[in-house]
């Protein structure tokens, strides 16, 4: 189950960024970002994910302050993590 502070589908930022906690159900193919093939883009390899915040599949994100995103998610701001 999602934690209480997880980003929800009706969150205005989530809507604006087309965030979906399940990347396979997201618009990542239609709105793919440069860096990796669309099917390899997800929050876990995005530079905005904060690996030291949250636990398990739920981590922090610089784009959603104080909230948690699913590492298997995707949004239109996905950017390949350096390194």
Curated annotation (Swiss-Prot):
Q: Which residues bind [4Fe-4S] cluster?
A: 43, 46, 61, 75
Q: Which UniProt keywords apply?
A: 4Fe-4S, Electron transport, Iron, Iron-sulfur, Metal-binding, Transport
**Reported temperature dependence:** Thermostable.
| MF GO annotations | 4 iron, 4 sulfur cluster binding; electron transfer activity; metal ion binding
Q: Which domain of life is it from?
A: Bacteria
| Recorded family membership | Belongs to the high-potential iron-sulfur protein (HiPIP) family.
Q: Could you give the subunit structure recorded for this chain?
A: Homodimer.
Instruction: Give the protein's recorded name.
Output: High-potential iron-sulfur protein
């Amino acid at each position: 189950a999602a934690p209480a502070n997880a980003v929800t589908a009706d969150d205005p930022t989530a809507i604006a960024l087309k965030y979906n906690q399940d990347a396979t159900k997201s618009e990542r193919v239609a709105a793919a970002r440069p860096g990796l093939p669309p099917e390899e883009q997800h929050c876990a390899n995005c530079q905005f994910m904060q690996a030291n915040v949250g636990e398990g599949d739920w981590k922090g994100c610089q784009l959603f302050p104080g909230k948690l995103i699913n590492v298997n998610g995707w949004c239109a701001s996905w950017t390949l993590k350096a390194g």
